[in-house]
Each structure stands twice: as structure tokens, then as C-alpha cells.
Amino acid sequence: MGYPEVERREPLPAAAPRERGSQGCGCRGAPARAGEGNSCRLFLGFFGLSLALHLLTLCCYLELRSELRRERGAESRFSGPGTPGTSGTLSSPGGLDPNGPITRHFGQRSPQQQPLEPGETTLPPDSQDGHQMALVNFFIPKEKSYSEEESRRVRRNKRSKSSEGADGPVKNKKKGKKAGPPGPNGPPGPPGPPGPQGPPGIPGIPGIPGTTVMGPPGPPGPPGPQGPPGLQGPSGAADKAGTRENQPAVVHLQGQGSAIQVKNDLSGGVLNDWSRITMNPKVFKLHPRSGELEVLVDGTYFIYSQVEVYYINFTDFASYEVVVDEKPFLQCTRSIETGKTNYNTCYTAGVCLLKARQKIAVKMVHADISINMSKHTTFFGAIRLGEAPAS
């Protein structure tokens, strides 16, 4: 019990059932009984367990080997040339890490300190140590050459560093220590002086010239605030002429009291025996010979007329027209009772848009009629109402 023994793997008892299972179970397509099927599954279970144990042993072996390499490498870096264990061999346990797994295994109690189980015998100490090293060399056959090369490299480094000075060993010891975690970042240093000004850069490519086309006008802005009232201007002189022009212009013509027979006394049937009662000379002009009334100013005019007629056995109705530039504008017709000499009046009126230089007149339609030019019953006139409305 004081030293590790080589594990002796005896043949598993499941080998025999494997043969039996291969012969009796239905692995090759033959029909198998229920008992043979159970033995086949039992064999497969033992086989899987054995394979898992082999894999676990292999993993432990690889872990032990890597741990031993790390310990040997660390010891060869820190130990001197005369220190035991730097020879790179496994001839003595002193070359191993005292805290390593192999050293702990070797440092177990000796057969004198541990109780023996029944049937075990003790070995001498020399034979025990030799047996232990043989086991280690058996498991790790390649560690010997690796350790020897490592020890030679350490000796060469020691010789080269001994000539460097008194600080050499201290630096080697510092280099051999494991580096701790990095500390926190220090505060930033002061800014350095400004560097020299660099050369001027390459001038850029000139931009594309813009167009001279003006864009569409924007929407009108909001109205500004109302300004203060201005100073009162001087009072102007009253324009009497303007006041007169704004007043309505009137013309009124009436008969002179004569009796007229149209067929014998009138030329073209137009009445011309008029007397002026009132007339604005700036707006109207009367032509006495032709009996026409001329308009001098554009505007809207109200035109009216009345004629008194009487019957002399020639016709049974009376009719006349108000013409503008010899074109009929208004017409008035009145029937007369035959066989009597009754007097009858006929009145008409209307509004007309007239332009300057236009002429208006009263024209009789039938020639076989007589007219009484009384100032109270026969008259003709016009009133200017104002400017013509904008079209």
C-alpha cells in the first residue's frame, strides 16, 4: 500500500457472454429467444462500461503527464546548477515539485507507517524507491530527454548571465515570477507642445456654377403691423366745378303751341319745333333745324317723350318713335276712334347707355296725322344718371 501498483486488467467476465451472445442472439438475422436477447443487452452494457473506464484512465494519464511537464519546467527555471533535480532525469524524487501530484503520491506513508492488509509483504526502502522510479519512467518515457534538454538550456543561461553583473540574478528572479494582473490606467499626462504647421493642402475642385434662373415666387407674407396715423394735411379749396359735374345733367324741350300736319310740315317725320326750358350745355346740344339732341358726354341717360295727336278722318291710330342715331329705341302707339276729332296723348320713356356724339330725336311713324305742339302736352327730354357701368 505504500507505493502505487500497476493495475492488472483481467479479462472481463462479459467476454464469455459476448461469445455466447454472438452465437445465440439474433445479431445475424436469426430469430433469438427472450433469454438470449437479455444476455446480449447485458454484454453490451458491460462492454460500454469497460470502454468508459479505459477512456477515463487515458484522460488521467494525459493530465498527469501535462502536470509533470509544467512542474519540471518551472523547477528548471528557478533551481540553480547544483540544486537536485536540475539534471533533467527522474532518478530521484527530489527533482519533482514537492506540491505536485506525483510527489504527493510518493510522499505517502511508508510500509512501516501504514498498516498492511492480510496477505501483503513489505519491501526494503531501496527496492521501493527503485520500483517507484521504474513506474514513473514506464508511464512517462519521453520526459527524460525533455528534462535533460531543459537542464542544458538552463545551464547555458546561467553561464551567460553570470557575466552580466551583480544585478543579473535579481533580474532573473524577477523574470521568473508570474506576472500579476495589470493595474488600473494612470491619469493622462499633460498635453505636449503643438507641432509645426503642415504644408498647405491641395486646392479643391471648383464647384459647379449655379444657374441664374430665378425660382418661383414664394407665398405672400403676413401683413405687417398697422403704422401710426400720418399728419393731417392742409385743407383744400372747394371744387365747385367738380360738384356741378357730379350733379345730374338735365335737358327739357317742349312745344311752342303750333299745330303741325306731318305730311305737309315735317321733313322725314322728325319734330323740330322745340323750345328749350332747361339744358346743360356741357352735356347736351340741340340742333334746331333737324330737331336732334346731341349727347356730349358718355353715360347712362333716362329719355322720355310725349306727343298729343288728333284725328282728321285719315287714320284710326297714332304712333311715333324715339330714335338714337336714326335707329328706333322707344315706340308709342295709340288707337283713335273714327268719325270724331278727339285729342289723344301717348307717353314713353326708357334708360339707355349713350356715348358722346350720339343723337336722339322724336320721329312720327304715319304721315296722315296732325300734332298739337302745346307746351303742356307735347314735350321731349333726357337726364344723365351717371357714368356708364364698367363692362
Swiss-Prot record:
GO terms for biological process: animal organ development; canonical Wnt signaling pathway; cell differentiation; cell-matrix adhesion; cytokine-mediated signaling pathway; gene expression; hair follicle placode formation; immune response. Its main location: membrane. Residues 1-28, 73-130, 145-245 are annotated as: Disordered. Residues 249-385 form the THD domain. Residues 1-21 have a biased composition (Basic and acidic residues). The record marks R159, S160 as: Cleavage. The keyword Transcription regulation does not apply. Keywords: Cell membrane, Cleavage on pair of basic residues, Collagen, Cytokine, Developmental protein, Differentiation, Disulfide bond, Glycoprotein, Membrane, Secreted, Signal-anchor, Transmembrane, Transmembrane helix. It is a single-pass type II membrane protein. It comes from the Eukaryota. One of its GO terms (molecular function) is cytokine activity. Cytokine which is involved in epithelial-mesenchymal signaling during morphogenesis of ectodermal organs. Functions as a ligand activating the DEATH-domain containing receptors EDAR and EDA2R. Isoform A1 binds only to the receptor EDAR, while isoform A2 binds exclusively to the receptor EDA2R. May also play a role in cell adhesion. Isoform A1 binds only to the receptor EDAR, while isoform A2 binds exclusively to the receptor EDA2R. This is Ectodysplasin-A. The gene is EDA.
